[in-house]
Design a protein with these regions (language model features):
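Alpha-to-beta junction loops
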Residues: 50-60, 104, 127, 149-152, ...
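Extracytoplasmic
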Residues: 4, 31, 74, 82-86, ...
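Short helix-initiation/N-cap motifs at beta->coil->alpha
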Residues: 36-47, 134-163
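Short, well-ordered beta-strand elements
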Residues: 3-14, 32-38, 105-106
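A conserved helix-loop-strand patch within extracytoplasmic ligand-binding domains
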Residues: 79-128
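N-terminal segment of the mature folded domain
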Residues: 30-33, 40, 45-90
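Ligand-binding "clamshell"
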Residues: 67-79, 94, 184-194
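Exported/periplasmic ABC-transporter solute-binding proteins
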Residues: 158-165, 172-195
């Protein structure tokens, strides 16, 4: 980055930026300055890293990284595995998966890897059917749903799912990435189901 001892890292604010802020003083004791750049979405930190504006980023899981590389012709690599954030299915005024009404809207992230994770979670909970053998490695999209059981599945940018859920009608559901759920004041214990 700007100097041999400056490390510029892009991250989403919760929990990634918070974790980086926690280690900032420890790195300073070792002679390094940690420059944290906060992003609201999942695309810009990878673009900034690929363009050399960052030394690293911290926000994604390996399937998302692989999908980003394939879609953007980049060759970004994971330097380390740090933690895993659970994906949760949240209900607005819905106490359990069994209480979901026909015609309910279910909002899920639209990017390849997280759409796959969301759809597999919905299948796990019996809310949709997918083809035999559907898996995270090969990926699935809403086009692969063989039976939506009368639910309206809507895909949106991952960083907007929590906000749309918070403004949704009672009876709606959303599958929310762990970091965005935390930022919205939700925890995995609030979820109807987790992957």
């Amino acid at each position: 980055s700007d100097g041999d001892n400056v490390i510029r890292v892009g991250a989403t604010s919760t929990p990634h930026g918070e974790i980086l802020n926690f280690v900032k003083d420890t790195l300073a004791d070792e002679g390094y300055t940690l420059d944290i750049v906060i992003y609201d979405d999942y695309v810009l930190p990878n673009k900034a890293l690929a363009d050399g504006e960052l030394d690293a980023n911290y926000f994604q899981h390996t399937p998302y990284l692989n999908s980003f590389n394939a879609s953007n012709g980049t060759d970004l690599v994971a330097a380390a595995s740090i933690h895993y954030e659970p994906f949760g299915l949240y209900g607005n005024g819905v106490a359990s998966v069994a209480d979901v009404k026909e015609g309910a809207t279910i909002v899920i992230p639209a990017d390849d890897s997280n759409e796959t994770r969301a759809l597999l979670l919905l299948k796990q909970e019996g809310l949709i059917d997918l083809p035999e053998g559907a898996n995270a490695t090969d990926g699935v999209t809403t086009l692969d749903i063989t039976d939506n059981h009368g639910y309206n599945i809507v895909t949106v940018q991952a960083d907007t799912v929590a906000a749309q859920f918070n403004n949704s009608d009672e009876g709606s559901l959303a599958v929310i990435n762990g970091n965005y759920a935390l930022a919205a004041g939700l925890s995995s214990s609030d979820a109807l189901a987790v992957e």
